[in-house]
């Protein structure tokens, strides 16, 4: 079980809605993922149309929608998008994204913190996408964010946990859930994040662009569940300086030597 703000989730796999070939394929994949929190970009939603191709099908799934402010380049733009989402969708949850750099889509730490402080004061449940910066994540936590979402690698890169060392620090010191977001390109990456101690992962591109998005979504679901089960079972300590035999020697060999000398 994972609790963020006032909501409990049984799945630690969060998913996105971008890059799918069709809305029907998106829905099939999201169902296969078992995800209960699905993020969507406000810039892609037609709020004037009651039968929006993205929004209408998502509402049928019965999951929590997490509108994001992707496309915002400043705190002011992000706050405006969050307010618009609350009014249009009736949710006070928001994934805060501010990335002015259109090439690498790296989050702006200064604008993100500024927007987070404003939105928290306005009653939003804020989940900020941010760099894997332990100091920034702590500041966002102190500002009242319900979780932090540090990147594993640049958005859509599928490179995995390139920020692993910093993620470990963030996880170790966080008092709110840590959701690894961006760069997760394979189920093994998601498994690694959960085993590392992350509370959840958010995956979009790796599922949407797969040859079979439905099968890939199911694979990610199994990977995350496997990682959670492994953590519950208790992972063994790692040894770097020596090996430890799985079957320690007893007096067995000594007894054989004595018998050979008789």
From Swiss-Prot:
Query: Transferase: present as a keyword of the record?
Result: yes
Residue sites binding 1-deoxy-D-xylulose 5-phosphate per the record: 156, 182-183, 204-205
**Cellular compartment(s):** Cytoplasm
Record carries keyword Transmembrane helix: no
Domain of life here? Bacteria
Main location as per UniProt: cytoplasm
Q: Which residues form the active site?
A: 95 (schiff-base intermediate with dxp)
Q: What is the protein name for this chain?
A: Thiazole synthase
Q: Which organism is it from?
A: Yersinia enterocolitica serotype O:8 / biotype 1B (strain NCTC 13174 / 8081)
Gene name, Swiss-Prot/TrEMBL: thiG
């Amino acid at each position: 079980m994972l609790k963020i703000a006032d909501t409990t989730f049984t799945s630690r796999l969060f998913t996105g809605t971008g890059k799918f070939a069709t809305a029907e394929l998106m829905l099939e994949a999201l169902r296969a993922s078992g995800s209960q929190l699905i993020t969507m970009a406000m810039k892609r939603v037609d709020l004037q149309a009651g039968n929006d191709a993205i929004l209408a099908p998502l509402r049928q799934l019965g999951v929590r929608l997490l509108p994001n402010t992707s496309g915002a380049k400043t705190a002011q733009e992000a706050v405006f998008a969050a307010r618009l989402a609350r009014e249009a969708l009736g949710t006070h949850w928001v994934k805060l994204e501010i990335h002015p750099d259109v090439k690498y889509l790296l989050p702006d730490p200064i604008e993100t913190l500024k927007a987070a402080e404003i939105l928290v004061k306005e009653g939003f449940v804020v989940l900020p996408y941010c760099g894997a910066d332990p100091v920034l994540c702590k500041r966002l936590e102190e500002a009242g964010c319900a979780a932090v979402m540090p990147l594993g690698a640049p958005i859509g890169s599928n490179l995995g946990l390139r920020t692993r060392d910093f993620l470990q620090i963030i996880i170790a010191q966080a008092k709110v859930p840590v959701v690894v977001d961006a760069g997760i390109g394979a189920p093994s990456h998601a498994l690694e994040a959960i085993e590392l101690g992350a509370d959840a992962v958010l995956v979009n591109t790796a599922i949407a662009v797969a040859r079979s998005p439905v099968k890939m979504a199911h694979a990610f679901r199994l990977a995350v569940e496997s990682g959670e089960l492994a953590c519950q079972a208790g992972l063994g300590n790692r040894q770097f300086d020596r090996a430890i035999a799985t079957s320690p020697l007893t007096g067995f060999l000594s007894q054989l030597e004595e018998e050979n000398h008789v």
